[in-house]
């Protein structure tokens, strides 16, 4: 019998061209970084961003791969007499070029936010009608990443709007990762591969594991709800073009079990890992989750293939993700609030993956099992494996 290594996630405890394209070579693995919105919303300023930059270095997050520091909404001031956007002078008195220089001095990359509409979601000036000016300004400031939102766009075509900003970024000449935040309304996974480097597949995430935060005309979703919305999308993801199920809520008050499950599933999805917590005051448990090198390696695997849900039974879901070197990641998610016991009979998990064109073949192959949360090898797949999965955990 052929012996393969198998990683198992088992958790117990330029000039404008006529046919402009996005910048190739960026986001060859899912982008990793931090964004201000989930924790701070519009309450951001120059001092906060600098202290976050410091914390990304001092905590070890930068060296773990989290390199993008992204300002979300509400950094904007007004446009100058020529129409160029300026930073809010009260919040960012030194200006965006100086802030970008500070971020770059820390070995980080500078991310910024705008909106395809006339106003951002926070009521600041949007980029509509100023796309080329804004792209030039971002390039001048040294921006490396643009999140482009979709508020105030009632009469705007999303394909045209996002392609327009893509072309503007290309014309400005600085390689900028283009993160499309259209909330999945126009199914961007079907058309945006040549437009952006990542696209939101859903509305906003809400800081809960299993809930819907309903509002008139829109809703925000818990971890499980967003996970369910990824069904049928995996074939559209890959190096340079990722499905984005939104930023992480790890470290924002959910249980350790829920945080671990959240991080595990986003890693299995090959999703961008964009933190949304206050990294200046993380608990050790949060650090241990966010900086687990072996789980991050599943997310960052060079094949860039999104995981799939193979089966579900009694509140448990069984997920596989093909990895390089003929390895597989395997994860059992417990959606229920109570502990679940299960005996894994590997022969029942023979599957052929249409995306990777690979077969698990437990009948003729023996895989070594490695628990990525304990960082220990735990036998192989020759024998059945009894497991206990805590509620809302993996």
Model-derived features: positions:
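Aromatic-lined carbohydrate-binding/catalytic grooves of carbohydrate-active enzymes
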Residues: 52, 56-155
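Catalytic cores of secreted or luminal carbohydrate-active enzymes
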Residues: 260-311
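Carbohydrate-binding surface patches
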Residues: 266-269, 274-276, 312-356
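C-terminal beta-strand-rich structural cap/linker in extracellular carbohydrate-active enzymes
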Residues: 379-394
């Amino acid at each position: 019998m052929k012996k393969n290594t198998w990683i198992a996630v088992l958790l117990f405890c330029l000039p404008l061209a006529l046919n402009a394209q996005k910048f190739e070579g960026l986001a060859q693995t899912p982008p990793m970084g931090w964004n201000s919105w989930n924790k701070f919303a519009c309450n951001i300023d120059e001092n906060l961003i600098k202290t976050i930059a410091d914390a990304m270095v001092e905590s070890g997050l930068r060296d773990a791969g989290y390199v993008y520091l992204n300002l979300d909404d509400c950094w904007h001031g007004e446009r100058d007499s020529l129409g160029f956007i300026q930073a809010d002078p009260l919040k960012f008195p030194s200006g965006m070029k100086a802030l970008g220089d500070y971020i770059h001095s820390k070995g980080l990359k500078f991310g910024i936010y705008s909106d395809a509409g006339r106003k951002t979601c926070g009521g600041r000036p949007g980029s509509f009608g100023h796309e080329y000016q804004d792209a030039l300004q971002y390039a001048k400031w040294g921006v490396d990443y643009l999140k482009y939102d979709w508020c105030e766009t009632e009469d705007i075509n999303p394909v045209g709007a996002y392609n327009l900003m893509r072309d503007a970024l290309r014309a400005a000449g600085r390689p900028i990762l283009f993160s499309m935040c259209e909330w999945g309304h126009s199914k961007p996974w079907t058309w945006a591969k040549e437009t952006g480097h990542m696209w939101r597949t859903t509305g906003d995430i809400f800081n809960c594991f299993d809930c819907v935060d309903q509002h008139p005309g829109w809703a925000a979703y818990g971890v499980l709800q967003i996970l369910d919305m990824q069904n049928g999308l995996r074939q559209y993801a890959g190096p340079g073009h990722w499905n984005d199920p939104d930023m992480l809520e790890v470290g924002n008050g959910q249980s350790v079990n829920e945080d671990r499950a959240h991080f595990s599933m986003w890693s299995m999805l090959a999703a961008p890992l964009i933190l949304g917590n206050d990294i200046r005051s993380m608990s050790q448990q949060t650090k241990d989750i966010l900086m687990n090198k072996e789980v991050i390696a599943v997310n960052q695997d060079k094949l860039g293939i999104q995981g799939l849900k193979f089966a579900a039974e009694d509140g448990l879901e069984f997920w596989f993700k093909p990895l390089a070197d003929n390895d597989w990641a395997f994860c059992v998610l417990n959606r229920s609030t109570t502990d679940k016991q299960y005996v894994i009979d590997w022969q029942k998990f023979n599957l052929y993956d249409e995306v990777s064109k690979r077969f698990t073949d437990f009948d003729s192959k023996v895989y070594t099992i490695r628990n990525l949360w304990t960082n220990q090898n735990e036998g192989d797949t020759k024998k059945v494996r009894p497991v206990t999965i805590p509620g809302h955990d993996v």
